[in-house]
Amino acid sequence: MIKSQKEYLERIEYLNTLSHHYYNLDEPIVSDAVYDELYQELKAYEEKNPSQIQANSPTQKVGATALNQFNKNPHLTRMWSLDDVFNHNELQAWLQRILKAYPSASFVCSPKLDGVSLNLLYQKGKLMKATTRGNGLEGELVTTNAKHVANISHTIPYNEEIEIRGEVIISKEDFNALNEERLNANEPLFANPRNAASGSLRQLDSKITKKRKLQFIPWGVGKHSLNFLSFKECLDFIVSLGFSAIKHLSLNKNHQEIEANYHTLIQERERFFALLDGMVIVVNELNIQKELGYTQKSPKFACAYKFPALEKHTKIVGVINQVGRSGAITPVALLEPVEIAGAIITKATLHNYSEIEKKNIMLNDRVVVIRSGDVIPKIIKPLESYRDGSQCKIIRPKVCPICSHELLCEEIFTYCQNLNCSARLKESLIHFASKDALNIQGLGDKVIEQLFEEKLIFNALDLYALKLEDLMRLDKFKIKKAQNLLDAIQKSKNPPLWRLINALGIEHIGKGASKTLAKYGLYVLEKSEDEFLEMEGFGVEMARSLVNFYASNQEFIQSLFDLLNPKNSDIIEEKQESSSIFSHKTIVLTGTLSKPRQEYAQILENLGAKISSSVSAKTDFLIVGENAGSKLSLAQKHGVNILNEEELLKYLKE
């Protein structure tokens, strides 16, 4: 019990010291229970003596104003993403490119924390803005919530403008405790610590963020006026301002030292306080960083050396069959829950029944499960030595699990051929509204599920007949949300032709193939198999899939095209092409150019060229920038015309 103002001031100082050890040094002096008791006594004293409350009291570090929305906010300097390397050879190649030009370069290595990147802007020593990475140029403004992250300083002993960047995470221990609380409260569990950190930082009610025990680990700076010579000095300076130091950070001179630290970190991975997915490698010398520069997306002076996929053993307790938009049946194993890289895995794909037979996977088998890239659960193999007689064969179904239509069993895949199967229709609509198709904002999986359950839609055409009163029947839909969705659906009309083709969800036809098809105009889907085969990059499977899809859905396609009226600006214009050297030519771009490759690709496509991603004997021109790599060697082998950027610009001016 605090009895005097002197004891009150001493308690503030003591609690701030405890917080520093817990969040910054990761060396807690007392248990959480003891801290909470001391904190509550402080709070009780302040309630009785409000005139004595100090600004540096732990109870006053943040406000608790609920947010109505997150505004977009630009970063003063771009927040880049890192290129990944996945093995010894890729790392060696990355290092050689740097060390060949800069033999004296050294490298700072540190754990790659799997959290949410955050940019803190300080001006005159005060935290002014906290912004998520977003698209790298701008993110969401979460300043109020960031002030609830215990080891984000509200003030720093540095008056110049500076952006301090780092990762917002939740420790494995706090994550498990949070999920335990949610389980007891019958609330949905977070899938992994990163999701928990992201969801906690973006709460509309900042009081919830405060309860989540988020931490901030700095890994760099954005805009600044520091005069340091090395990246390591920058990190040390950030720590001197009161921020947490990065554990297991090291300075390395060569490939051998980097690999040694990488393997040490892998050994520490399970014991590390937070979730890791790799090791970040950054050139230490800032002058070399400046000279190396950036690609369109990433710095050339840094990379993320990803960890190998983790594997665990568990048991298959059941199998369910999912139906995709093409009608393909995908068997999914139901597993005894197992934790891999911080996520509880209860399902894993079995891909198809041919693979089940090939791997001899049985029900009740103990199996090896991995999360490839720490994301996608897969079953690698059964552990046959564990079989005890309870195992039984996984039977290939004969009818669709959704519509009971007889299935077509091919050598590898099994298909539901019923075009009106509700599962196929739902998956088709989810794809139709997806980012690389018509990109209908607000029309996600759950909304489409509801629309089907309410029998409001059966295909894409029905979307455009929806009314406000229809959407008001859906769960959690009010007038504003319903109107926003209707507006988004109407906005999807008049799409680029390639988007509409991609939205159809034709088997074997993705985004790239859709763009190629769009060049041939609005009636491209009416072409014959032979005509499709003449197109760059189209094989027999793709051609037959297009012909069969159009034959089965001709009336639907025509109605959809009439309703949406796609733009046909991608059609090749013969007059425009005729005067260009690039007309009707197949062109590949490689290496680093002064402009983004996509910008040059668009210019060349407008002149009638066909842009390809791979070099072959059919390639007419290879446009090369710096670090052209294997495509240059292949082009020389095939006798392809090779142009550098200067020569390309010369031809474009003609």
UniProtKB/Swiss-Prot annotation:
Annotated NAD(+) binding sites: D32, A33, V34, Y35, D36, S81, L82, R133, E167, K306
Domain of life: Bacteria
Pfam families found in the cross-reference section: BRCT, DNA_ligase_aden, DNA_ligase_OB
Residue span(s) of domain BRCT: 577-654
EC number from the UniProt entry: 6.5.1.2
GO cellular component, as recorded: cytosol
Catalyzed chemical reaction(s): NAD(+) + (deoxyribonucleotide)n-3'-hydroxyl + 5'-phospho-(deoxyribonucleotide)m = (deoxyribonucleotide)n+m + AMP + beta-nicotinamide D-nucleotide
MF terms (GO), sorted A to Z: DNA binding; DNA ligase (NAD+) activity; metal ion binding
Alphabetical UniProt keywords: DNA damage, DNA repair, DNA replication, Ligase, Magnesium, Manganese, Metal-binding, NAD, Zinc
InterPro entries named in the record: BRCT_dom, BRCT_dom_sf, DNA_ligase, DNA_ligase_AS, DNA_ligase_CS, DNAligase_adenylation, DNAligase_N, Hlx-hairpin-Hlx_DNA-bd_motif
Gene3D superfamilies listed in its UniProt record: 5' to 3' exonuclease, C-terminal subdomain, BRCT domain, DNA ligase/mRNA capping enzyme, Helix hairpin bin, Nucleic acid-binding proteins
Active-site residues, Swiss-Prot/TrEMBL: K112
Biological-process GO terms, alphabetical: DNA repair; DNA replication
Cofactors required: Mg(2+); Mn(2+)
Group of enzyme by EC: ligase
Classification via PROSITE patterns: BRCT, DNA_LIGASE_N1, DNA_LIGASE_N2
Ligand binding (Zn(2+)): C400, C403, C416, C421
NCBIfam families attached to this UniProt entry: dnlj, PRK07956.1
Family classification: Belongs to the NAD-dependent DNA ligase family. LigA subfamily.
Protein purpose: DNA ligase that catalyzes the formation of phosphodiester linkages between 5'-phosphoryl and 3'-hydroxyl groups in double-stranded DNA using NAD as a coenzyme and as the energy source for the reaction. It is essential for DNA replication and repair of damaged DNA.
Protein name, per record: DNA ligase
Species for this entry: Helicobacter acinonychis (strain Sheeba)
Gene that encodes it: ligA
